[in-house]
Amino acid sequence: MQQIHRLERKLLRATAEAIRDFDLVSQGDRIMVAVSGGKDSYTLLHLLMRLRERAPIDFDLVAVNLDQGQPGFPAQVVEDHLRSVGVPYRMLQRDTYSVVRRLVPEGKTTCPVCSRLRRGVLYNAAVEMGCTKIALGHHRDDLVETLLLSALYSGALKSMPPKLRSRDGRNVVVRPLCYAAEEDVAAFAEAMRFPIVPCDLCGSQPNLRRKRVKRLLAELSAEHPAVKGNLLHALAHVVPSHLLDRDLHRQLADATGRDPWLDAEDEEAEDCGEPSAGDGVVSLGGARGGR
């Protein structure tokens, strides 16, 4: 029980800080919490329910689970949990599984197509239900893994934003767990004995690139525990004058009337690839950056 309280406090602090930093929840919001049956979404729902009890503003939560027609999906397990915690909920059924199997060649990962179809269903449901925001359970590790995936395999410096508006302009998506470490989320979900639904019911091949990046981060973290926290910190501390983005450079030059590259400090002599004296666990606001 003591472990549960310790983990809950830690996760509540990280979630509350993200909500404050990025204005993720507003007075009168009706927030759809997408609950897949995994550790992340169960934890997100629990934390938002706890924060709602003590928040200085009023907002509503409604949990939504989508049965995509995957063989053996235990929708009743998820529904029983939602009923037991006393949150308003809605169970959706859309056979996107057969669409995915038709579109994706055998042996290829179905996750990207499946995710897009699922997101579309949730977007439409949110509008129908009058929800002002959709909360997803992506955590810190998802953000830093996506940062490396984008840089290494797509040649772009980008990750998952804490808040975004959908392309059609109808929905706002928020990620309140963006400061929370996956290991804390996993430990909390296990301690709470959430009824976890396996994520491989579809039989899809795993995303090998993401698995490789996750392995790389684990190896680096074993040598330097602050690696993941530092990567998250980097997402919030961009130094445009030390990047090669000409469009960004032009925007800054137009806004300031100065050439950002000529204003850049010469740090090359210090950059030997080794930790500096100040290296270690950094924080993003008040959230710890190490674990």
Swiss-Prot record:
GO molecular function, one term: tRNA binding
This protein's pathway: tRNA modification
Catalytic activity from the UniProt record: cytidine(32) in tRNA + S-sulfanyl-L-cysteinyl-[cysteine desulfurase] + AH2 + ATP = 2-thiocytidine(32) in tRNA + L-cysteinyl-[cysteine desulfurase] + A + AMP + diphosphate + H(+)
Pfam family, any one: ATP_bind_3
Main subcellular location of this protein, as a coarse class: cytoplasm
Cofactor(s) the protein requires to work: Mg(2+); [4Fe-4S] cluster
GO biological process, one term: tRNA modification
Annotated motif PP-loop motif, positions: 36-41
Co-factor binding comment: Binds 1 [4Fe-4S] cluster per subunit. The cluster is chelated by three Cys residues, the fourth Fe has a free coordination site that may bind a sulfur atom transferred from the persulfide of IscS.
Residues that coordinate or bind [4Fe-4S] cluster: 111, 114, 202
InterPro entries, A to Z: Rossmann-like_a/b/a_fold, TilS/TtcA_N, tRNA_Cyd_32_2_STrfase, tRNA_thiolation_TtcA_Ctu1
Region (Disordered) location: 259-291
GO cellular component term of the entry, any: cytoplasm
Keyword match 4Fe-4S: yes
The entry's keywords: 4Fe-4S, ATP-binding, Cytoplasm, Iron, Iron-sulfur, Magnesium, Metal-binding, Nucleotide-binding, RNA-binding, Transferase, tRNA processing, tRNA-binding
Residue stretches of biased makeup (Acidic residues): 262-273
EC number: 2.8.1.-
Protein family according to the UniProt entry: Belongs to the TtcA family.
Note: The thiolation reaction likely consists of two steps: a first activation step by ATP to form an adenylated intermediate of the target base of tRNA, and a second nucleophilic substitution step of the sulfur (S) atom supplied by the hydrosulfide attached to the Fe-S cluster.
Function: Catalyzes the ATP-dependent 2-thiolation of cytidine in position 32 of tRNA, to form 2-thiocytidine (s(2)C32). The sulfur atoms are provided by the cysteine/cysteine desulfurase (IscS) system.
Complex formation: Homodimer.
Stated name of the protein: tRNA-cytidine(32) 2-sulfurtransferase
